């Protein structure tokens, strides 16, 4: 009888340890445009900031699962709004379900929207206001569920012009992030007019050093959480 009891205690102890280890691991979801997809300056899907974050979580034995299904070079904010509203699926997964599962979320959206509008920047501040109202819909949905961390990437300007437009967009994006207590990642201080992180001129896609720099900023915040 004692032997059976000891075996039962041992089994329960192992089960509790296993469960605690599993509970400490995190489901990492990244959403968004070319930055979250990890597209390099040559237009090829390569190693992005989210892949470096995934590597950190894996090496520190904190990674449960990593998902970048809902990333695409051409995604705009309105695309993600539509995907959520209509519960659209991709590769047999829905973003709605993935958001509910995620412990850590990183999002990069709006760069495509901004650079598209720069060629015709009439009423651009109204355009940005409407763009961020749509972004708010996404963040409001995410906020309904518990997450350890949500990181939102800000905007940067590689053109050397229209800085006031990017400052306005970043200021209001940060206000939206603060509203939900999500972490805003300031990229403009690092990337604006910094050729170190861009291998091709007239191209706002960072090189591998740029992606690694983004990941370092986010990883540092994860460590300090």
For the regions a protein language model found, what residue spans apply to each?
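Sec-exported extracytoplasmic/periplasmic mature domains
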Residues: 54, 58-59, 85, 110, ...
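Active-site segments of SGNH/GDSL-like serine hydrolases
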Residues: 108-112, 139-168
């Amino acid at each position: 009888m004692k032997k059976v009891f000891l075996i039962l205690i041992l089994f329960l102890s192992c089960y509790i340890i296993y469960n605690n280890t599993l509970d400490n691991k995190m489901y990492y979801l990244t959403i968004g445009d070319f930055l979250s997809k990890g597209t390099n300056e040559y237009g090829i899907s390569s190693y992005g900031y989210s892949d470096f974050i995934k590597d950190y979580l894996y090496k520190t034995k904190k990674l449960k699962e990593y998902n970048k299904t809902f990333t695409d070079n051409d995604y705009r904010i309105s695309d993600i709004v539509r995907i959520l509203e209509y519960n659209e699926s991709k590769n047999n997964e829905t973003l709605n379900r993935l958001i509910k599962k995620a412990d850590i979320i990183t999002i990069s959206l709006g760069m495509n929207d901004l650079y598209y509008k720069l060629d015709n920047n009439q009423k651009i501040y109204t355009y940005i206001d409407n763009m961020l109202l749509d972004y708010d819909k996404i963040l409001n949905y995410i906020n309904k569920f518990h997450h350890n961390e949500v990181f939102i990437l800000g905007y940067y300007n590689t053109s050397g012009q229209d800085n006031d437009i990017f400052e306005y967009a970043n200021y209001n994006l940060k206000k939206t992030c603060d509203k939900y207590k999500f972490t805003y990642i300031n990229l403009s201080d690092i990337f604006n007019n910094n050729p170190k992180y861009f291998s091709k001129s007239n191209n706002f896609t960072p090189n591998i050093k740029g992606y690694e720099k983004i990941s370092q900023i986010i990883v540092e915040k994860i460590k300090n959480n």
